[in-house]
Amino acid sequence: MKLARVIHRDGTPWYLSDDTEINPDIGTVVQVERKTYKFSGTVAYVVHFPGCVGVKELEVSAFNRYFEFL
């Protein structure tokens, strides 16, 4: 896993895999896993937020819009 931080937000909450929602502040540090789907080769990032059980999976372009690696 790598660390990243939130660099942009538009105010709309994100829904996590456990049906909770989060609206993190800019600067929030998160853990990130890279996931590659075997069938298609598509790459996604799975974002783990502090204090949350659920995760948010984002395609690379969406991840790059909202996060930067530390």
Where do the model's predicted regions map?
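Short intrinsically disordered terminal tails
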Residues: M1-L3, E68-L70
